[in-house]
Amino acid sequence: MNAPEILNGAATASPADATEATQTAARAKTPLTRREQKEAYENNKLFKRLARQVGEAIVDFNMIENGDKVMVCLSGGKDSYAMLEILMRLRERAPINFDIVAVNLDQKQPGFPEHVLPEYLKQLDIPFHIENQDTYSIVKRLVPEGKTTCSLCSRLRRGILYRVAGELGATKIALGHHRDDILQTLLLNMFYGGKLKGMPPKLQSDDGKNIVIRPLAYVKETDLEKYAELREFPIIPCNLCGSQPNLKRAEMKALVRDWEKRFPGRIENMFNALSNVVPSHLMDHKLFPFAGLRATGEADPQGDIAFDEEPCSTDAAEGAMPGATKSISIVQFDDL
């Protein structure tokens, strides 16, 4: 996509006409109270921020191209609802043509409200497909009682969605993972997997046949929570299967939330670090040729300053005011 055009579209888009209070007042031709005006302003600002961030992610990673058919995976949770609505709004103003089809996988979990998503999608007047597959029975049969079923369930779901994408002729599969999901995955892999690995905004599927995109990659979960409350999405609970929660991921989520609250700027810096990788200062010899490294006798502006204190830019440092900079010593001579 063309960056200026789609981002301009994001800036001018607005939610389904802000809040109920705004709509009611407009119909009645009565002036808004100061509180209602403030709420309408904040809600509109929230949508513009979400649309801008989604537009930026699409542009930065070339997620959607002219002629694409994007299969939006709709689970019934706040993230996928918001993703679908924002993509629909951006499409109205995008400089390219692309189609959207919403897909939900009904896994036959007990108590799953089968009517909710079809009714909602019919109101949106958007093409959709409900795939009925009883993966619930398979998972319950194979996973011991009390164990987390999420891993097997996700593998089954992934295979089904890849197949459905092929049947529908989808060229991109859109998932609703957001910024916090990406950081939680990074921490999980570091703490429990021994890998410096996150969750990419765009990837080729493991079967080699699909391109998976995450348009919400730049979006904070707290913003999605506010937006879902504003839009009153018909949220479907994610615990219908009765599985035990993923305690490790819950731990990472709590950690990220705590850091963001207590140390303003820390989480944003962590997220920015994913886009500013320096392989020569890590330890993966597959990414950098340490074995063949030799002194050339010529100055290298990118060379290491091993005996100096390395300054950190802290424009968004913990507790710092925007625009402030401060040098933080991260290498002490006692450590050398």
From Swiss-Prot:
Keyword flag Cytoplasm: yes
Cofactor, how bound (note): Binds 1 [4Fe-4S] cluster per subunit. The cluster is chelated by three Cys residues, the fourth Fe has a free coordination site that may bind a sulfur atom transferred from the persulfide of IscS.
Entry-linked InterPro entries: Rossmann-like_a/b/a_fold, TilS/TtcA_N, tRNA_Cyd_32_2_STrfase
EC nos: 2.8.1.-
Pathway of action: tRNA modification
Predominant place of localization: cytoplasm
Pfam (any one): ATP_bind_3
Sites where the protein binds [4Fe-4S] cluster: C150, C153, C241
Protein keywords: 4Fe-4S, ATP-binding, Cytoplasm, Iron, Iron-sulfur, Magnesium, Metal-binding, Nucleotide-binding, RNA-binding, Transferase, tRNA processing, tRNA-binding
Chain spans, region Disordered: 1-34
Keyword check for Ubl conjugation: no
GO terms, biological process: tRNA thio-modification
GO molecular function: 4 iron, 4 sulfur cluster binding; ATP binding; magnesium ion binding; sulfurtransferase activity; tRNA binding
Family to which the UniProt record says this protein belongs: Belongs to the TtcA family.
NCBIfam families attached to this UniProt entry: PRK10696.1
Protein function: Catalyzes the ATP-dependent 2-thiolation of cytidine in position 32 of tRNA, to form 2-thiocytidine (s(2)C32). The sulfur atoms are provided by the cysteine/cysteine desulfurase (IscS) system.
Quaternary data: Homodimer.
Protein name from the UniProt record: tRNA-cytidine(32) 2-sulfurtransferase
Protein source organism: Paraburkholderia phytofirmans (strain DSM 17436 / LMG 22146 / PsJN) (Burkholderia phytofirmans)
